[in-house]
């Protein structure tokens, strides 16, 4: 499982029934850890004095937890982009000098927007390699706060990183977002969690967030399960030929603040019915087929970019033409996801095209398929979203499948429990 050159060959089940164990939400887990650590610091207590419950066990969350708990002089976050952004802001307001670094790919993921904003607030941050990219040396101290303006169309994680430290700033924070604001549900999730822990934080207008100086409250935080991870089971339900297929997904709830809960709406157009239930006091979702798929899907993913690979893969397998917009952040994710999708679907004979630099378009064009395994580019969502395509391409092979540990460590075991056969 740890061999970089491992390849899994997948054979789908004839019937799709059962209960699927989902990981806890990575987005909520990482925010809960940072807020909990800041709450403890405000009371001169050690970080992680009170641990959130049902914490995600994915790589991103584990490296964040270890960094907050141990605070080593050199923090290596591996490929965890969320950890890089959130911890950079956290370290800027935390006494001590730390170096934060990661994989070679991480050293090519831009962070200048966040660093520049933190410097405006008084942070002492030095680039140790190429200007604008990790690794960083962060010398933490009390920051004054004030007014900062950053682009709203780059990454909502820059916004969330700044917002979460804002209650610790002497003068609070007025954060102005320029241009189109992408992934707004993730910003709303951050603000909601901050308020749950006692912060005075909210939108002052359509493009400005105001956070007043006020210590966080220490709180036992229970984390719900992950809608992003549920999307791959929606994909499986959409693609299976089992008309009586039924999956139970515990730990998902109606009214979730997670942006990727939009998956239930999108997949209602791709043949999947979502039923909310409560069994023995636990909220959950039951998936069934509704046998209603649109003839074409046009959609703007500006608020849920992490669903793009799942929906592109599903539409390609079902032969549904599409035009998808709002994908500008996909080029700075774990890989260039737009190019990765284009190259890997071509191996399956699907010729998607890129328009306007970031739009993905497919009108049914085909190309000559190859027998090469699907490459994952060290990107968990490539492996996660392509695996259910074995319903359409039995025997589909995926290279470097262990990348799923970044967000869904037990994915392959859950696939096997659901009846998929996995051959190495």
Residue locations for each model-derived region?
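Short, structured segments at the rim of ligand-binding sites
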Residues: 1-424
């Amino acid at each position: 499982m740890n061999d970089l050159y491992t390849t899994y060959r997948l054979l789908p089940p004839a019937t799709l029934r059962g209960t699927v164990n989902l990981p806890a939400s990575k987005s909520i887990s990482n925010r809960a850890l940072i807020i909990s650590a800041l709450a403890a610091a405000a009371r001169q207590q050690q970080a992680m004095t009170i641990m959130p419950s049902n914490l995600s066990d994915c790589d991103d969350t584990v490296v964040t937890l270890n960094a907050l708990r141990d605070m080593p002089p050199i923090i290596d976050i591996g490929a965890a982009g969320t950890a890089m952004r959130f911890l950079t802001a956290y370290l800027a307001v935390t006494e001590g000098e730390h170096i934060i670094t990661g994989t070679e790919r991480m050293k090519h993921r831009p962070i200048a927007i966040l660093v520049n904003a933190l410097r405006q607030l008084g942070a002492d941050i030095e680039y140790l390699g190429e200007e604008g990219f990790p690794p960083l040396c962060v010398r933490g101290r009390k920051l004054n706060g004030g007014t900062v303006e950053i682009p709203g169309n780059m990454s909502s994680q820059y916004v969330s990183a700044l917002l979460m430290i804002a209650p610790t700033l002497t003068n609070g924070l007025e954060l102005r977002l320029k241009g189109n604001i992408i992934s707004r549900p993730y910003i709303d999730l951050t603000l909601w969690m901050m308020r749950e822990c006692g912060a005075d934080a909210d939108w002052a207008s359509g493009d400005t967030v105001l956070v007043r100086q006020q210590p966080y409250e220490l709180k036992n935080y229970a984390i719900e399960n992950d809608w992003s991870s549920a999307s791959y089971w929606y994909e499986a339900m959409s693609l299976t030929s089992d008309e009586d297929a039924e999956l139970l997904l515990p730990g998902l709830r109606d009214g979730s603040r997670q942006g990727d809960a939009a998956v239930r709406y999108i997949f209602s157009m791709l043949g999947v019915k979502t039923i909310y239930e409560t069994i023995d006091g636990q909220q959950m979702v039951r998936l069934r087929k509704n046998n209603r798929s649109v003839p074409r899907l046009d959609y703007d993913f500006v608020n849920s970019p992490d669903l793009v690979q799942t929906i592109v893969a599903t539409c390609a397998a079902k032969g549904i033409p599409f035009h998808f917009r709002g994908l500008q952040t996909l080029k700075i994710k774990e890989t260039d996801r737009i190019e990765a999708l284009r190259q890997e679907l071509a191996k399956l004979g699907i010729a998607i095209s890129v328009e306007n630099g970031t739009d993905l378009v497919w009108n049914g064009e085909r190309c000559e398929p190859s027998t090469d395994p699907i490459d994952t580019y060290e990107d968990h969502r490539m492996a996660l979203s392509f695996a259910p395509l074995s319903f359409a391409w039995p025997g589909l092979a995926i290279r470097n499948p262990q990348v799923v540990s970044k967000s869904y460590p037990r994915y392959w075991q859950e696939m096997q429990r659901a009846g998929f056969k996995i051959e190495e």
